[in-house]
Each structure stands twice: as structure tokens, then as C-alpha cells.
A protein has these predicted regions:
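Conserved mid-sequence domains
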Residues: 168-181
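Primarily the internal scaffold of c-type cytochrome electron-transfer domains
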Residues: 1-8, 17-138, 142-166, 170-171
Length: 181
């Protein structure tokens, strides 16, 4: 895959630590956001669900008319109140027409919902791919909690993939990552 027209390589996300022995932890903001946007509405690519706790995400979703109004003023420079109000009404109707309002929207955001995107190949491994935004469950384990916001576990990314291995990446810089990975 490519990001901003540049081919994605192992080093795009995986950076050696200062010793060159291990890799730095991958973080969403630094390594994932460019490919895995939190945009939930393809009609408004600049409007994203916050990468925050479930209560904040639920509050964002339940305040969508306000979020759309702020987005229209900030990003689309809609300054007339009537124009802004019409924009918000259109966006809310677009969501409703796709069954993405209220509980259905929350379910689609918190739980991956099975939306599958284009097939991609990473490090030679094929797969069905995922939509650019496929819900919190794309990376996190999400547990329903009845009427309360769901429990969202931190993404499970190990600090060391092979805890007992004694391998020094710095000694293998002449090799392509794909030769082993």
C-alpha cells in the first residue's frame, strides 16, 4: 500500500530503538493514523471519531449535529447559519439513509461490523483487507456493557515479539526485512 503517494515499507512503521537491537513500540498517532483514519463518514473525510475512551466516542457520536456544524464552519468555511443548518440536515439524512444513526451508528463505530475493504498485501501476506475505518474492534477488543459504553481493551501489541530471542537488527541492516518477515 502507499501513503501520500509513497510506497509503504517496513521502516514506515517499524523503527529500531537506540541500541538497534529491538524495535520501538508502534503507536497509533505516529505509525497507524496515516493508513487507518478514524473517519466514519466518507462524505466528510476531515471529520473523525476521536481516538479516545468509549465515553468520549459515545459523546462525540451523540453530538453529531454539533460536530457536523463545527466541521462545516471550520473546514468548509460555512459562515451563514442557514447554510450550516442545511449542511447538518443533509449529513444526518445521509447517515440515516445508510442505517447509520443512533444505536446502529454506535454499533458500526465500536464493533468492526464486518465492513471489508480492498484486498491488500503486506510483507507478502495476502488478505481481504479492511475499510479505512472499520470500527474500534479493528485493533481493540470491544466488550459490550449493556446500556453503558462498551469496554475497549488496549490494542495488544507486544513490546517484544520473540521474548527469548537474542537477535540484533543492527547487524542485519544489509538484508531486506522481507527476507525474514
Amino acid at each position: 500500500p502507499s501513503v501520500n503517494g509513497k510506497k509503504l515499507e517496513c521502516a514506515s512503521c517499524h523503527q529500531p530503538d537506540a541500541s538497534g537491537v529491538f524495535m520501538q513500540r508502534v503507536s497509533f498517532e505516529r505509525n497507524c493514523r496515516a493508513c487507518h483514519s478514524l473517519n466514519f463518514d466518507e462524505n466528510n473525510p476531515g471529520l473523525e471519531v476521536p481516538h479516545a475512551g468509549p465515553a468520549q466516542v459515545r459523546a462525540f457520536l451523540r453530538s453529531l449535529p454539533t460536530q457536523y456544524a463545527d466541521f462545516a464552519a471550520r473546514e468548509l468555511k460555512m459562515t451563514r447559519q442557514s447554510e450550516n443548518r442545511e449542511f447538518v440536515a443533509r449529513q444526518m439524512e445521509n447517515l440515516r439513509s445508510r442505517s447509520l444513526s443512533g444505536e446502529n451508528l454506535e454499533r458500526a463505530v465500536f464493533f468492526a461490523g464486518g465492513r471489508i475493504g480492498e484486498a491488500t498485501t503486506i510483507a507478502g501476506l495476502g488478505g481481504p483487507g479492511r475499510a479505512r475505518f472499520a470500527g474500534c474492534a479493528y485493533c481493540h477488543e470491544v466488550t459490550p456493557k449493556g446500556e453503558a459504553p462498551p469496554l475497549i481493551s488496549p490494542a495488544q501489541v507486544p513490546d517484544r515479539w520473540m521474548a527469548n530471542a537474542r537477535f540484533n537488527h543492527a547487524q542485519h541492516v544489509s538484508m531486506s526485512c522481507l527476507q525474514c518477515h
